Amino acid sequence: MAQSTAFLRIGTRGSPLALVQARAVRARLAAAMGVEEDGIELVVIRTTGDIIQDRTLAEEGGKGLFTKEIEEALLDGRVDLAVHSAKDMPTVLPGGLILAACLEREDPRDVFISRKARSLAELPKAASLGTASLRRQAIAMRARPDLRVTPLRGNVETRLRKLNAGEVDATLLALAGLRRLGLTEHATHVMSADEFLPAVAQGAIGIETRTDNKRVRDTLAGIDHANTSTAVACERSFLEALDGSCKTPIAGHATIAGDAVQFRGLIARPDGSAAHDIAGTGHRKDAIIIGREAGRELKHRAGPGFFD
């Protein structure tokens, strides 16, 4: 096999959204390095999450299904960095890897999409809601316990196609993904973060590399969006304190204004029958502590049997 002559090799999934995100990172890196974009290679890697389409992520082991094979390529040197939807990254990264940078966050809110109603509240009684996200399921059922939740897997385009084919009455998707794909015309209603708290790191593009690769880490520092990285660090520390995975309905969202961090978090039972939420605020330098303490407090408040 011919040796790559690329300045950098970026590992990415092959879905349309993943490629849009990887190309955005490549463009930023090329500008920062003063090289042509074609000097930075995109290496498409198929992940377990891409292969498994008939079961939910919770059934198959939760977070990491969309990153495992890419992280293996990082660790064995086949790629120099990896681009992920930050919300798909495992709570604890494999040893030797680091979340080195984030691009500026896109709108983190969820959108309601349906041809039968203008909002979640207006769906007919016992309507079918298609989602593979336990967070979306729990928050939706908290408001509408009559809904029938149907697992809906696949990339954004696949889920929209299934909705349009009448397989479900409605679905919920990330606004960020629709925007990046130029598909916002499909959004029926944008849910406010107050009514539908986003997933941890939703809307953020995370860039992962090896801890010992100083050259790449230094390069990534030049394209990092500090406020996004601070918010994501706060949210991920909340997730880690809860031992969170795709098996657990968890939501968390941090915002940065000047030196202040505001954080909101939520845990729920999958059927929405019980939930606990929390808010915290403090200085941005304490963002990780704010998230961690919020997670510990909710874990204590909910009790050891909450997720059983």
What are these regions (language model features)?
Residues 2-46, 52, 59, 67, ...:
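Small-molecule-sensing regulatory modules
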Residues 62, 66-67, 71, 85, ...:
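Non-catalytic, solvent-exposed segments at the cell envelope interface
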Residues 79-83, 169-170:
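Short, Asp-centered acidic motifs that coordinate Mg2+ and/or phosphate
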Residues 72, 120-121, 160-161:
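Alpha-helical segments flanking ligand/cofactor-binding loops in enzyme cores
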Residues 84-85, 113, 130-132, 172-174, ...:
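Short beta-strand segments
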Residues 54-80:
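Short, structured active-site "lid" loops
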Residues 86-87, 95-147:
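A conserved helix-loop-strand patch within extracytoplasmic ligand-binding domains
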